[in-house]
Amino acid sequence: MEEHQALVIDNGSGMCKAGFAGEDAPRAVFPSLIGRPLQRSIMVGMGNKDAYVGDEAMSKKGILALKYPIEHGIITNWDDMEKIWHHTFYNELRVGPEEHGVLLTEAPLNPKANREKMTQIMFETFRVPAMYVAIQAVLSLYASGRTTGIVLDSGDGVSHTVPIYEGYALPHAILRLDLAGRDLTDYLMKILMERGYSFNTSAEREIVRDIKEKLCYIAFDFEGEMKKASESTAVDTSYELPDGNIITIGNERFRCPEVLFQPNFIGMEAAGVHETAFNSIGKCDIDIRKDLYSNVVLSGGTTMFEGIAERMTKELTAMAPASMKIRVVAPPERKYSVWIGGSILSSLSTFQSMWITAEEYEDAGCGIVHRKCF
């Protein structure tokens, strides 16, 4: 194992983050998507592939049908996923997987069969010498320098609140919220339509995602912000589309991410992220709640909105017992903190005995993943 640096691959619903253990940021960050030509005939004779991965698929999005093999944080299309991993090794990192240990990440409460399938593909298709599967939220907590806390991890496909005590996730208290970046993008498309701007295709949706990432923010006081927006143009701002047209966006800027706190905006009967975190803490032993409230760690791209930590603090303070000290931590690198945690973990000397080796896999089969990764 020692002679080659381990690889860390964080497979998110929206983006794949990959790189080398011990480095402080991923080398490759690309969309977790596969594009297939809409019409076979157009592409004839251009030496075209039957499938494009990542950025290349994104750049040809006008003539491709785009599909994401990871839905709500969980791999649903294994053939496409294998293509993404192949692309990661050979095109993005330019390494031979048979020479490197690979640390993969998984969603909390990932079905057992899924971890087994990941293990099988790594050893049998890619012939890796060693691998490990770690829970995303736990890695984010490590990256923040903690071993106890509650992580609100919200990416493109799913959000989770994961209480962690002394390095171990507490499965009975993990809550999943099927509301994340992709839903916010959809909602922004919908409310921009009310303004008369129409975005329909998968290509136009990527434009809306960009608007969301660049211009949206979370209001500290939603009602107050709505009132302010109706009385003045203080929140109005403009965005230039790829064709040069300029659109104006106003209260949509904070109405869009407000869905995280009020899922009923999109017709979802679910608790908002603040209430989900509160409920998660409530499922934990009373003796550790204080440690969780004082270490609420945000992670994932959908927690990148300006104002989220302040709003989260306000909402949790209103729900928690009065004497409780609440601290919400929003590390600046939280978009990549899962990957960073994986980079830290896989380069620790104490971790080297934790790898599942190819020999162990030969002996025990894919069930070994449940014994060695928890």
UniProtKB/Swiss-Prot annotation:
It catalyses: ATP + H2O = ADP + phosphate + H(+). Keywords: ATP-binding, Cytoplasm, Cytoskeleton, Hydrolase, Nucleotide-binding. Its EC number is 3.6.4.-. GO terms for cellular component: cytoplasm; cytoskeleton. It comes from the Eukaryota. It is found in: Cytoplasm, Cytoskeleton. InterPro entries: Actin, Actin/actin-like_CS, ATPase_NBD. Its main location: cytoplasm. One of its GO terms (molecular function) is ATP binding. Pfam families: Actin. SMART domains: ACTIN. Belongs to the actin family. PANTHER family: ACTIN. Actins are highly conserved proteins that are involved in various types of cell motility and are ubiquitously expressed in all eukaryotic cells. This is Actin-1.
